Curated annotation (Swiss-Prot):
Name used for this protein in its record: End-binding protein 1
Underlying gene: EB1
Organism of provenance: Giardia intestinalis (strain ATCC 50803 / WB clone C6) (Giardia lamblia)
InterPro entries, A to Z: CH_dom, CH_dom_sf, EB1_C, EB1_C_sf, MAPRE
Effect upon mutating residue 20 to A: No effect on phosphorylation
Subcellular location: Nucleus membrane; Cytoplasm, Cytoskeleton; Cytoplasm, Cytoskeleton, Spindle; Nucleus envelope
Outcome when changing residue 130 to A: No effect on phosphorylation
Length: 238
């Protein structure tokens, strides 16, 4: 089996939004996940990975809702081991993910969703067992759905021809708009990522160099860095 390559930064997987990802993982695992930072625990990925490769994840070793970085590291090492054994070419920067920073975890979250969709062969509408972890379910409401299904089976032509038609020109225009939006989204994502890298470099530099500006000054370099970090890592509120 040839290795499954991780997509580059221009891949469509990096255009999936935070809200969609959190909704997906919450429904998949039947466990509410409210923040991207919660994924730093690693146990969510272990549970989902055990659906892709049933029985290959030793769920007895997984530390659920891990808080300490060393516990989280153990979970991500389990994930890395399973991926490597299945010839998946994806390096995991464990040291970054376990700190719980939004940008690092969001990027890995996007990749994992892409990977799951590419490799999961089970039913996404029924209950699925996840090793020794909790049962992972994704249910749909009965009633109206079954009724509409029965109606479509009785009258297949009606279901196949219903809805407005879109000509090729309109479809092409929509594709161009989507492509433009994706490029703009990636552009701003890259900017944020560069700022995060710069902040890490500045924090490291400030531990080695004495700053002459008084600490109570709004232009004090540590104050500037702290303010930018506050903006970068502020939680989203609907």
């Amino acid at each position: 089996m040839p290795p499954v390559k991780a997509p580059g930064n221009v891949s469509d997987c990096y255009f999936v939004g935070r809200v969609s990802l959190l909704k997906w993982i919450s429904e998949l695992l039947n466990e509410p996940v409210k923040k991207v930072e919660d994924l730093a625990s690693g146990h969510h990925y272990c549970m989902a990975l055990n659906l892709v490769y049933p029985g290959q994840v030793n769920m007895h070793r997984v530390r659920m809702n891990a808080i300490n970085e060393w516990e989280r590291s153990e979970n991500f090492k389990i994930i890395q081991d399973v991926l490597s054994r299945n010839n998946i070419d994806k390096g995991i920067d464990v040291n970054k993910l376990v700190t719980g920073k939004y940008m690092d975890n969001f990027e890995f979250f996007q990749w994992f969703k892409w990977f799951f969709d590419q490799n999961y062969k089970g039913s996404k509408s029924g209950a699925t067992e996840s090793g020794s972890a909790n049962a992972v379910t994704k249910t749909s409401k009965p009633g109206n759905r079954s009724g509409s299904t029965a109606a479509s089976m009785q009258n297949p032509k009606a279901s196949s021809t219903s809805g407005p038609s879109i000509d090729s020109k309109e479809l092409e225009d929509l594709r161009r708009q989507i492509a433009k939006g994706q490029l703009e989204s990636q552009f701003y994502f890259d900017k944020l990522h560069e700022i995060e890298i710069y902040m890490d470099q500045m924090n490291e530099l400030m531990t080695q160099v004495e700053i002459a500006e008084p600490e109570d000054s709004p232009f004090y370099i540590k104050s500037v860095v702290k303010k930018i970090e506050d903006i970068l890592y502020a939680e989203y509120h609907q």
